[in-house]
Regions:
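Charged, gly/pro-rich active-site loop segments
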Residues: 1-11, 83-154
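Short, basic/aromatic recognition patches
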Residues: 2-26
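Hydrophobic alpha-helical segments typical of transmembrane helices
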Residues: 12-16, 61, 101
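Short secondary-structure boundary/capping segments
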Residues: 17-18, 43, 63, 117-119
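Short beta-strand segments
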Residues: 23-57, 63-65, 71-75, 84-86
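Short, surface-exposed beta-strand-loop junctions and turns on beta-sheet-rich folds
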Residues: 59-61, 80, 143-144
């Protein structure tokens, strides 16, 4: 079985654009304040360079990332779960006072201009994942053999 390909330039390869542009969800692994690991599913947007996701300051996810910015995201192709980009890096937070971050996610996933579920007083932040390494995995055919989907190895 071939190893995943490193993109070497910290960019998602074009062969995986459909995964990050689609209405798929990311699994975000992070470190909790006590040193144990946590993994959460998040909705996200990708701007062609960075993956961004949103959370409330009251959530554990925010507390985890405020203490340790290291993350690993995996976004699986729902039709072929062995095909995915993995993005490792640091999640940098910005206040989302104008709600543009969460509203862009609402537009992508709900086709709504404004995210409808925040309550008065909710403090929202957007995390931008600055990649340190990106890997892109192959598709595995139904017979179990790997298919090369055009990722160059070097």
């Amino acid at each position: 079985m071939p190893k995943p390909a490193d993109t070497n330039n910290n960019k998602i390869p074009e062969s995986h654009y459909d995964i990050v542009k689609g209405n798929n969800y990311a699994q975000v692994a992070m470190v909790m304040p006590n040193g144990s690991l946590a993994n959460n599913t998040v909705a996200f947007v990708w701007d062609g360079e960075f993956v961004r996701f949103s959370t409330l300051k009251a959530r554990q996810k925010y507390k985890n990332l405020a203490g340790d910015q290291r993350v690993a995201l995996c976004i699986a192709d729902p039709a072929h779960p062995w095909r995915y980009p993995e993005i490792r890096g640091n999640a940098e937070s910005t206040e989302d006072t104008d709600r543009s971050g969460i509203n862009s996610i609402a537009k992508k996933y709900m086709n709504q201009d404004v995210y409808p579920f925040d309550q008065p007083g909710d403090q929202r932040v957007t995390f931008t994942v600055k990649p340190t390494r990106i890997r892109a995995e192959y598709v595995h055919a139904a017979d179990g053999t790997p298919e090369n989907i055009g990722i160059q190895r070097g």
